[in-house]
Amino acid sequence: MRLSGKVAVVTGAGSGMGRSTALLFAREGATVVGSDINAANLEAVTAEATAAGGKMIGVLGNIAKREDAEALIQRAIDDYGQLDVLVNNAGIMDAMEGVANFKDETFERVMGVNLYGPFVTCRAAVKHMKERGKGAIVNVASVAGVSGAAAGAVYTASKHALIGLSRNTAYAYAPFGVRCNTLIVGGVETAIMAGADPAKFDHEALAQYGKWHAVNPRTLQPDEVAKLSLFLVSDEASGVNGAEVAVDGGWTAAC
């Protein structure tokens, strides 16, 4: 198992890509500390991981709040004495507002989850990882982080900035054995694509959206993203640092 003996924190673990990542990491031998704002979802994925023979605990919290983000990292260290892996997966979309009409509350909410939360968790994690001389971080961004659009100004800006955080972290902490990479994710079949309301998820519309932008005419599944996260945090990717790695079905081929 590729993560045997390692402790991994996964944010947004209650659904979508985070859920798939937490379950896969647990199957690969990691002790998973999963965080989510949705108690029912977090309880369900924790139970599923445990029932399958894995090790996972759930920590309820809002990653956009400094105290919750810091407590999450500290919980892993306090309970298990180490932190080997951090996956900043939690993310939300805006109302697809352009720069001329975005709302202040939208900016604060989206930047809080998509950027401030990862800043705080990275800050807490790298201090511990530096002392241990090893660690791996994956920040989950988006094709919006390497391209532009007429709408979604705040979301796009948050993902561009997240890539900057990853690069800076990789450069600063490489001498101490800490790696940090970014996943560039395309259209994935998750609740975030429907405003976090699964009942509104339009599979056909999302598939068509993907066709306009990608070589691969289908939406991706959360498991496909999780598998790449697994590779990036494993020892197999020991030479990969400060990189943006796309799992987008070919979307960025046109960028």
Residue ranges and their predicted role:
Residues 7, 14-16:
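Conserved glycine-rich cofactor-binding loop
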Residues 93-96, 147, 211, 230, ...:
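Short C-terminal tail/terminal secondary-structure segment
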Residues 97-99, 103-108, 209-210:
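Substrate-binding pocket helix/loop in short-chain dehydrogenase/reductase
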Residues 122, 158, 166:
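Active-site helix of classical SDR
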Residues 142:
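Residue(s) in the substrate-gating loop at a strand-loop-helix junction
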Residues 174, 179, 240-242:
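Short, small/polar-rich loop/turn modules that mediate ligand/substrate recognition or access, typified
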Residues 214-225:
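A conserved structural motif in NAD(P)-dependent oxidoreductases
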